[in-house]
Amino acid sequence: MSSGLDLQPRPVPGPVPAWAFPAGVAGRVPAGPATLRCDLPGRRLAAVRLVLHAGAGREPVLADGRRLDGVATLTAHALAEGTEPGGGTALAAAFERLGASFFAHADLTALRVALDVPVTRLPAALELFAEVVRRPALDDADVRRLVRERLEEIAQEDADPGTRAMRELRAVMFPPQARASRPTGGTPESVDALQGSDVRAFYGSVVPAEATAVVAGDLSGVDVDGALTAAFEGWAATGDPLPDPDRTMPDSTARIVVVDRPGSVQTYLAFGHGVPDRSHHDWPSLAVAAHVLGGGLTSRLNAKLREEKGYTYGMRAGLLRMRHCGLFVAQGAVHTEVTADAVSDALAELRGLASDGIDADEHGASVRALADRAPAEYETARAVAAELADVSANGLGSDYPSAYLAAVRASTPDGVARTYRRHVDPEALTVIAVGDAEKISEPLEQLGYATVTVTAGEKEKE
């Protein structure tokens, strides 16, 4: 029976509008950091990102052999305490009066200090921002309070199986002397030993001339160069040079490591393999390959383990970025009783991309997902500034985002498959399983992929 409704045909998506990543204008503050100014008309919230080459990869080892693991993260937290002992609340209030927000964090590569503020108040906010980064208190009492808070954060991180799996993956793939083998934010033992003097010495060794200050937003009518010069001119290091960044490469070998969590009803799985860093011409194709495998609900890992087998709520795959290398990682949680089956099926999919290649449809879908989302992904000044800060921290140049997107679009199914085969050996994967060792170790051993070793979870270690 006809409804009599005259339905209009479904709209057909039009072509993707031409778009290019915003270009920045490079400069330098006299006797200070490099600058990168990016004018984004209509973005009335400005974003400032100061990149200091003082990440966890440059944390020193003292003469007595004590490693200052976690001092970069603790320093980032301590900057938010302001220029006076116990001044964190007053500093937050001062930024709030300007409608601004201030935060900082550290990773292996860099310590990044951030400011978001309406463009009309950018000069005043930059003045306050400069006071904080040039003359922070880094007070003993504040640092010890932050140590206690950081220890609580570490305990929370240990309770998360995904975080625990990634930490174990790095610990296994990198040798113990490599900084990347240990938690970026430090261990409970290393963090508990940190004092205010350690934080002050570390921050005093920062070389401002090696830093980069990125400013993005609608900068019309704002003397950004003048404000940056007033903020940072003459800023100099006061301490001994930091050690060179650690560049130890990962070891890609077939192994299965079980992190024991007795009674766990799920197993968190992580599959890892070393790949080149982002400066390598194969990185964009590796990103496409990772997306084909685990970039969405229709990806190969999800189609098999979620949709067909019902083992998991979702798997994902991607590239872990470090300055000197990368890691291909596939991960997700599965039911305990199907752990070995899930590993077997995941390995089959990881092998299948190498042996069978990629078809045009899934390649096209992944390219569109990675490249066509860029206009929305970089809609805000915050996103643009964060990306420019990241490429600066990794020595890639401000034209890298555009070159990366162009390379993704120019990739081909055969080229992506060849790149994957060149850099990812499915027979040399590190497999981490965070779960009940009593229930999953023997089935994993029976797979015959690699010898299974068991390490205690945090509660057992205590």
Regions flagged by a language model, labelled:
Residues 29, 42, 206-207, 262, ...:
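Extracellular/periplasmic catalytic domains that process cell-envelope and extracellular macromolecules
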Residues 229, 247-248, 303-304:
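Short, conserved active-site entrance elements at the starts or edges of catalytic domains
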Residues 26-27, 34-39, 200-203, 254-260, ...:
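Short, surface-exposed beta-strand/loop micro-motifs that present aromatic residues
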Residues 2-47:
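N- or domain-start disorder-to-order transition segments that initiate the globular core
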Residues 49-119, 182, 295-311:
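M16/MPP (pitrilysin/insulinase) zinc-metallopeptidase core fold and M16-derived inactive scaffolds
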Residues 7-9, 13-19, 48-54, 62, ...:
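Extracytoplasmic/periplasmic mature domains of Sec-exported, cell-envelope-associated bacterial proteins
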Residues 35-56, 61, 67-71, 240-298, ...:
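His/Glu-based metal-binding/catalytic segments typifying zinc-dependent metallopeptidases
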Residues 1-12, 90-241, 308-310, 314-462:
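Charge-rich, well-structured scaffold segments of protease-associated domains
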